[in-house]
A protein has these predicted regions:
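Active-site scaffold of zinc-dependent metalloenzymes
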Residues: 81-82, 86-142
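Juxtamembrane "helix exit" motif at the C-terminal ends of alpha-helical transmembrane segments
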Residues: 200-222
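Active-site recognition of the HExxH zinc-binding catalytic motif
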Residues: 143-160
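Membrane-proximal soluble helical/coiled-coil segments
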Residues: 2-19, 133-136, 287-310
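N-terminal leader/propeptide segments of preproteins
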Residues: 1-95
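Hydrophobic core of alpha-helical transmembrane segments in multi-pass integral membrane proteins
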Residues: 197-207, 228-234
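Post-HExxH zinc-binding segment in Zn-dependent metallohydrolases
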Residues: 161-201
């Protein structure tokens, strides 16, 4: 998909819904309550950053992400590999993300590290890194290259919504594994992982201490209970949030909308939960039409996935 350069963005007209739909199809989603002029300013910034990366790679042979991470030009992920992700993201969410630079990274990696994305909306920074093992392999350890890249590109596309409840849910739907798709939404933030591991590590330390001492100087059962509380909370929360999104999807289908995942991918948590409550199809369509009248984001969603503008 050919995107406009930073200098060409300003030529897009407010009534050019087809071009706006193409930008959306490239993963350049309109932010909540973002108007047309602000959207173009942001897209111009995004394109400028992408062009900046290309220019620096051509000029100096590397791009400096920060003081510790310098990305050489030879580690730039080629378009042919990034395009593998489109086979997953197009049928799921109707996006082919080709504007986010990606690099293979090899230094200081843990055994479980597969990749990550960097997003800074204020500075229009969008970039992702994946393990260098994927430069020559389509699969490494428990990861598939197309799954991992599509996962990171989903984060890049949806970051503008600044809505974290379903962020990991949508990213993990790119996985072919049912277990990963189900459990992926459990960990929303770094604190979820921290509070998950902390009591488990405390239990391990307590158990090792008792083994070394050779006698029970304190009961171990409270540590077992503590280690199970937060994992249970994560599972229950994940189950409840999945029920909301599945009900929302069912109600959208009942209203005659077929590209349900694409619509929900661009929706906020409050909108998703509202869809879950609207069992009356007429009320649901009325709600969407009201959003279309007030938001550019929903105008494009309606054109692409509800009015069959594609």
């Amino acid at each position: 998909m050919i995107l406009p350069s930073a200098s060409e963005v300003k030529d897009i007209r407010p009534d050019d819904i087809e071009t706006l739909a193409k930008l959306d199809a490239s993963g350049l989603i309109v932010a909540p309550m973002e108007n047309f002029s602000d959207y173009l300013i942001r897209i111009e910034g995004v394109m400028s950053f992408t062009e900046k990366v290309t220019t620096e790679l051509d000029k100096s042979g590397h791009f400096e992400l920060d003081e510790k991470i310098v990305l050489p030009a030879e580690n730039l992920i080629p378009e042919s590999i990034i395009e593998e992700a489109a086979g997953i993201t197009v049928p799921l969410y109707g996006i082919t993300v080709c504007w986010v630079p990606g690099f293979f990274l090899s230094q200081s990696l843990g055994i479980l590290w597969g990749g990550c994305s960097y997003t800074d909306s204020e500075n229009n920074l969008n970039l992702f890194l994946v393990r260098s093992s994927f430069a020559t392999r389509k699969k490494w350890f428990v990861y598939r290259r197309d799954e991992l890249i599509s996962h990171e590109l989903c984060h890049a596309a949806r970051a503008v919504l600044n809505d974290h409840t379903y962020e990991e849910y949508f990213a993990y739907q790119t996985s072919p594994k049912k277990t990963r798709r189900y459990l992926g939404g459990c960990f929303r933030t770094r604190f979820d992982a921290l509070f998950f591991l902390l009591p488990i590590m405390t239990l391990l330390i307590a158990q090792i201490s008792l083994t070394i001492i050779g006698r029970n100087i304190f009961p171990i059962w409270p540590f077992w209970i503590a280690s199970g509380i937060f994992p249970a909370f994560l599972l229950i929360r994940n189950h409840c949030e999945r029920r909301h999104i599945h009900r929302a999807g069912a109600n959208l289908r009942k209203a005659g909308i077929s590209r349900v995942n694409a619509v929900l991918f661009r929706s906020l948590t409050a909108e998703i939960k509202h869809f879950a409550k609207l069992k009356d199809s007429q009320q649901l369509i009325k709600y969407i039409n009201e959003r279309v009248e007030s938001e550019l984001r929903w105008r494009i969603i309606h054109y692409r996935f509800i009015a069959d503008g594609e």
